[in-house]
Regions:
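N-terminal Sec-pathway targeting helices
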Residues: 2-26
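C-terminal region of N-terminal signal peptides and the immediate post-cleavage residues
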Residues: 26-50
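Substrate-binding cleft of secreted/luminal carbohydrate-active enzymes
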Residues: 31-39, 241-243, 265-334
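Chitinase-like catalytic core of GlcNAc-active glycosidases
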Residues: 46-73, 78-82, 86, 90-230
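Conserved, mostly hydrophobic/aromatic
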Residues: 87, 164, 236, 274, ...
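Glycoside hydrolase catalytic-domain groove-lining segments
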Residues: 105-110, 188, 241-282
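Alpha-helical structural signal in soluble globular domains
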Residues: 111-118, 153, 182-190, 228, ...
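Short, well-ordered secondary-structure micro-motifs
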Residues: 137, 206-209, 248-249, 284-286, ...
Length: 334
């Protein structure tokens, strides 16, 4: 995925992490495969459909000059009749010191205006990301970095909010909570929103600690840490993919589990989104034949409790196929 060096580093980090963590997850989860198959059993409630608060992650081509008004019109037509309300447009990546190079998104202000005209009521957020310091290489130091200037920069371009995707953040990291509190103070004062991408929640208590010992990398968060993060933002998007599971039924059951855990941890006044994998890869952590939009939507619907501030988010616009869009429409928009 060509969205800048930082995003490519995140994808490489995921691939390296998969070598051990995905096997640990696979062994753990397959040991409880009966539970996941049980999660996938049953019939979703008829009311488990979009509330009109869904989202779409969008690539960097929208802000660097590669997209035109014709592309905006085509996107508006594609989104018509769906439940998509938020667009996370990749405006970064951030530098490790938190700065955002203005040369990266020269068409940002134009894009926000064009989207507001073409899709009345849409909320356009600036997707900002970077790799966090890890033993495998330098990155952003969450204990010291200040993301307020970069956030001010994108809000000045007209964005309706800031969507942060900083990876990998260990469960319990205090620096990340500090960063969120600082940016949230800014967005709240400006009448904008702060959204954040988060990893999955421990399928078993303490599993994030086991993964950390095995790999020196985080894979899951504790429910308590997810709750603490959610208290500092307006919107949480769970990246409920890259599960290493080999069958659609297992993946659907896993998404059902992750959705239930997120619903329990994220306060009802915070917007909760469950990410759908609208991309296909063949890696140890992602089996494209299993991790489909249709399977993920089924898992979401099975866990849907009727909460008002709840939806799904498709990742990502430039890899989503007509089949992905059809699965979203038929399974969730209905």
């Amino acid at each position: 995925m060509a969205m800048g060096t930082a995003v490519r580093r995140v994808r490489r980090w995921v691939a390296r992490l998969a070598g051990v963590t995905a096997l640990a997850l696979l062994g753990t989860v397959l040991g409880a495969a009966g539970g996941l198959w049980a999660n996938d059993a049953g019939t979703p409630r008829a009311e488990a459909v979009t509330r009109g608060g869904d989202a779409l992650w969008m690539g960097h081509a929208w802000v660097d000059g590669r997209k035109s008004q014709a592309d905006v019109a085509a996107l508006a037509a594609q989104l018509r009749g769906t439940g998509i309300h938020d667009l996370f447009v990749h405006a970064g990546p951030l530098a490790n010191d938190g700065r955002l190079d203005p040369a990266l998104d020269p068409r940002a202000a134009w894009l926000v205006r064009a989207l507001h005209r073409a899709i009345p009521g849409v909320r356009v957020q600036a997707w900002l990301g970077d790799v966090v310091d890890t033993p495998e290489g330098p990155g952003m130091d969450l204990s010291r970095v200040d993301l307020v200037p970069a956030s001010e920069q994108v809000l000045a371009d007209g964005f309706d909010g800031v969507h942060l995707d900083l990876e990998p953040v260990p469960s319990g990291d205090r620096g990340f909570l500090r960063v969120l509190a600082q940016v949230h103070a800014l967005t709240s004062a400006r009448g904008r929103v702060l959204s954040v991408s988060v990893p999955q929640t421990d399928p078993l208590p303490g599993l994030h600690e086991v993964a950390g010992l095995l790999t020196n990398h985080p894979k899951w968060w504790s429910s308590d840490y997810l709750h603490q993060v959610a208290l500092r933002v307006d919107q949480v998007a769970v990246m409920a993919y890259d599960s290493a599971l080999p069958l659609p039924s297992l993946f659907s059951g896993y998404v059902e589990q992750q959705t239930r855990l997120a619903l329990a941890a994220v306060p009802p006044g915070v917007d909760l989104l469950i990410g759908l994998p609208a991309y296909t890869e063949s890696t140890m952590s992602h089996h494209g034949s299993a991790e489909t939009v249709a399977a993920a939507v089924r898992g979401v619907r099975l866990a849907d409790s009727g909460r008002r501030l709840f939806g799904v988010a498709l990742y990502v616009d430039f890899t989503a196929t007509p089949e992905d869009w059809a699965a979203y429409r038929e399974g969730w928009v209905r």
